[in-house]
Amino acid sequence: MTATASPSDTKGAAAPRISFVSLGCPKALVDSERILTHLRAEGYELSRRHDGADVVIVNTCGFLDSAKAESLAAIGEAMAENGRVIVTGCMGAQPEEIREKYPNLLAVTGPQAYESVVAAVHEAVPPAHDPFLDLIPPQGVKLTPRHYAYLKISEGCNNRCTFCIIPSLRGDLVSRPAGDVLREAEKLVKAGVKELLVVSQDTSAYGIDTRYATSPWQDREVRARFYDLASELGELGAWVRLHYVYPYPHVDEVIPLMAEGKILPYLDMPLQHASPSVLKRMRRPGNQEKQLDRIRRWREICPDLAIRSTFIVGFPGETDAEFEELLDWIREARLERVGCFEYEPVRGATANDLGLLVPPEVKAERKRRFMEAQSHVSLRLQRAKVGKRLSVIIDEAGPTGARGRSKADAPEIDGSVHVTSRRPVRPGDIVTVKIERADAYDLHGIAV
């Protein structure tokens, strides 16, 4: 995900101007929003152009080497167009790699280093004397469209997957108090947000680090626990979508909330593979037969459940037989939304010590076969929706039609619903659409 801050409508001649680039995942986007909210409260304005800013901030991604390359390219562009650049984010946890290429950066800070970023901005271009708190909407500065927002509930991760370096970049799990999360969510909904996308590194581990500590919310105490938070969010009147859910046993508890309509019947659960031996090398839960049984039970409880997952092909040592296990599993699981990535070595990941690298051409062929198998599954599931009426949230609207998403579709990573409507619709509207046509990823219908 890449986001660039938009300028405000305020034209203070003396106000310092910031250009901002946000790279990486939705969790990083929330970090960017937090930094921008702080700076806007101090009177800084936002510039669309690097060359029109007093300083440029680049929030980097350092998860994969390809993401690092994108981050370095963005830094280079900012240096070329402006020259006064502050770097933050996951790649900032390895400053020597950045400084080696760009030694003249103003500052390099790691992830979640909000105060350090703000301090670096202050040093580069001091804020105006008087704060402009009236410039800040109650929900803070957001880089998403007005009708949806990411809600980060924790930082860090306690898992030690061998392909991942997130714990070394962002640390162990640190959960936010439930009351704080709910107050932020309430502000967002009051400001017009129709969809809350709950994110973290490990959403279903929420509260484990605090032993499910309680905190005040309205007139009662609420536990920092996955189920409790999901239930309370479901009372706010917005769509609630759960992302990055690790398949712990207690995930079963939220499925009835989906069946009752309190939260969306959508579960983003990165499973990574299906072969027990590959999962063991990944240090991931290894009983995918049991996982199939769980998915069947979930669908019995909530027939409309849409499961999104991501998988890695070409993990070190992956054999033809292990890959065939994965293909067999996805055909049987019939997941609604699936992504696939070729394994990419990450500097510092313990998977690098496994050896037995899969050749690039084999990884590419396995990804092709995987996506081909999943496309047949997806097409069957999509065609089953033809003739049905679905609730669709509108993302974009034009004179002849609109594009939106069903409850089974998250922004940017899933498909779309293309809507024909006789009456005007606007982004954020939730309309009923009769589905007339389907392909493997998108639906087409008419507003009724």
UniProtKB/Swiss-Prot annotation:
Q: Which residues are connected by disulfide bridges in this protein?
A: none
Assigned keywords, A-Z: 4Fe-4S, Cytoplasm, Iron, Iron-sulfur, Metal-binding, S-adenosyl-L-methionine, Transferase
Q: Which reaction does it catalyse?
A: L-aspartate(89)-[ribosomal protein uS12]-hydrogen + (sulfur carrier)-SH + AH2 + 2 S-adenosyl-L-methionine = 3-methylsulfanyl-L-aspartate(89)-[ribosomal protein uS12]-hydrogen + (sulfur carrier)-H + 5'-deoxyadenosine + L-methionine + A + S-adenosyl-L-homocysteine + 2 H(+)
User: Would the keyword Signal be found if you checked this record's keyword annotation?
Assistant: no
Molecular function per GO: 4 iron, 4 sulfur cluster binding; aspartic acid methylthiotransferase activity; metal ion binding; protein methylthiotransferase activity
Residue ranges of every copy of the Radical SAM core domain listed in the record: 143-380
The entry's [4Fe-4S] cluster 2-binding residues are: C157, C161, C164
Annotated Gene Ontology cellular components are: cytosol
Q: Which cofactor does it need?
A: [4Fe-4S] cluster
Q: Where in the cell is it found?
A: Cytoplasm
Q: Which note does the record give on the cofactor?
A: Binds 2 [4Fe-4S] clusters. One cluster is coordinated with 3 cysteines and an exchangeable S-adenosyl-L-methionine.
Family to which the UniProt record says this protein belongs: Belongs to the methylthiotransferase family. RimO subfamily.
Recorded hits in PANTHER family, A to Z, give:
RIBOSOMAL PROTEIN S12 METHYLTHIOTRANSFERASE RIMO (PTHR43837), RIBOSOMAL PROTEIN US12 METHYLTHIOTRANSFERASE RIMO (PTHR43837:SF1)
**Listed name of the protein:** Ribosomal protein uS12 methylthiotransferase RimO
Species source reads Methylorubrum extorquens (strain CM4 / NCIMB 13688) (Methylobacterium extorquens)
- Gene name, Swiss-Prot/TrEMBL: rimO
